[in-house]
Every structure is written in C-alpha cells, then in structure tokens.
Amino acid sequence: MFSRVALRAAPRQQPFSLVARRTFQTTRAQLSSPYHYPEGPRSNLPFNPKTRFFWFRYLMYCVVGFGSPVAIAVWQTYRPRS
C-alpha cells in the first residue's frame, strides 16, 4: 500500500515517516534524447496543426468521436422494441 521508496527513505532512528523526500531538478533538453526534436515543436506530429482549416477538422473529429457514442446510446434507448 505504501511506496517502497517512502518506506526506504524513512530514517530508522527518527519517528517513522511515510513522506518521501524528492528533489526536482531542471536541466536543458538533451538533443540526443529521443524525446526532444532539434527541428522544434510539432515536428513529430503526423499532421500539420498550422494549416488554415485544422481547427475545423479537429472540431469535426471531436464531434464525431464524442458524439457517436452518445448518439448510439440515444438511438438504442428510444428505438421501438421488436
């Protein structure tokens, strides 16, 4: 139930503590990393979000994706029983 790191980080001579001490560091992005692209942001996407009608295509994608399950549920709820 408790994190092993929290249990390991608790000192034995002090009262038992379940809080793990974390240190966050900030470093510059390593360009040799597979998670950072030297071409810049949006270079790894399979579509171009800077096109003229991207907003419309994205809106239609969301409407179809979120609207289809709702429309199917409503249709199945109100269809006549056979």
From Swiss-Prot:
Task: Provide the GO biological process annotations.
Answer: mitochondrial electron transport, cytochrome c to oxygen
Compartments annotated for it: namely:
Mitochondrion inner membrane
Q: Where is the transit peptide?
A: 1-31
Q: Which InterPro entries match?
A: COX7C/Cox8 (IPR004202), COX7C/Cox8_sf (IPR036636)
What's the protein's topology in the membrane? Single-pass membrane protein
Q: Which domain of life is it from?
A: Eukaryota
The record places the following residue ranges in the Mitochondrial intermembrane compartment, namely 76-82
Sequence intervals crossing the membrane: 53-75
Pathway note: Energy metabolism; oxidative phosphorylation
User: What UniProt keywords apply to this chain's record, in alphabetical order?
Assistant: Membrane, Mitochondrion, Mitochondrion inner membrane, Transit peptide, Transmembrane, Transmembrane helix
Q: What does this protein do?
A: Component of the cytochrome c oxidase, the last enzyme in the mitochondrial electron transport chain which drives oxidative phosphorylation. The respiratory chain contains 3 multisubunit complexes succinate dehydrogenase (complex II, CII), ubiquinol-cytochrome c oxidoreductase (cytochrome b-c1 complex, complex III, CIII) and cytochrome c oxidase (complex IV, CIV), that cooperate to transfer electrons derived from NADH and succinate to molecular oxygen, creating an electrochemical gradient over the inner membrane that drives transmembrane transport and the ATP synthase.
Q: What is this protein called?
A: Cytochrome c oxidase subunit 8, mitochondrial
Phylogenetic placement of the source organism: Eukaryota, Fungi, Dikarya, Ascomycota, Pezizomycotina
